[in-house]
């Protein structure tokens, strides 16, 4: 008696990995979810169980990077003892270490690093801003609720712009092991922390010299 073949539905990660492989091998998205599913031996419904479209899959990829970064940080015995600026620095280093392991796919999704479609980063932005707001201490105690809210908004938006500047630097970085990105993170975090909490001049000049040397515009 013939045994009926059991088809195991793919996991979310397996679908994402197959999609990334296809895009990197062909240089473009699959023609359709139906064709992509059939070529990889699973049903179209298996794809839609996790993603409404290829664009949603790509946006989800960046959100999952954030989640994996946070999981890694939370496993560190020292992370929770860090101050806000130290936590943010640790986040950057961990995130871009993970990004390096997926560099080809990330550069592909960001249109070869042109950052033309920031909508792909919208869910990541939401997660990051909530994170920045939770860890960064406001530099000034303001009793006026509206002014205090404005201060918090400015602080988290500045953190997001810093994150984007590091992201752009990393995409363009051609140094071995992307070591210049590590330097940029250190100088950028120090300069921004000094700007918000301390005397900024020396750190800002130091960061400016580094950017000028690398011929990179933040």
Report the location of each language-model feature.
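Helix-turn-helix
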Residues: 28-60
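C-terminal peripheral helix-coil segments that are non-catalytic and often amphipathic
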Residues: 172-218
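Amphipathic alpha-helical segments used for helix-helix packing
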Residues: 99-119, 133-140
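Hydrophobic alpha-helical connector segments
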Residues: 75-105, 115-116
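Hydrophobic alpha-helical segments that form the core
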Residues: 150-171, 183-191
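Amphipathic alpha-helical packing segments from all-alpha helical-bundle domains
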Residues: 118-143, 153-165
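Basic, helix-initiating cap at the start of DNA-binding domains
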Residues: 1-22
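An amphipathic alpha-helix adjacent to DNA-recognition modules
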Residues: 12-17, 48-74, 78, 89, ...
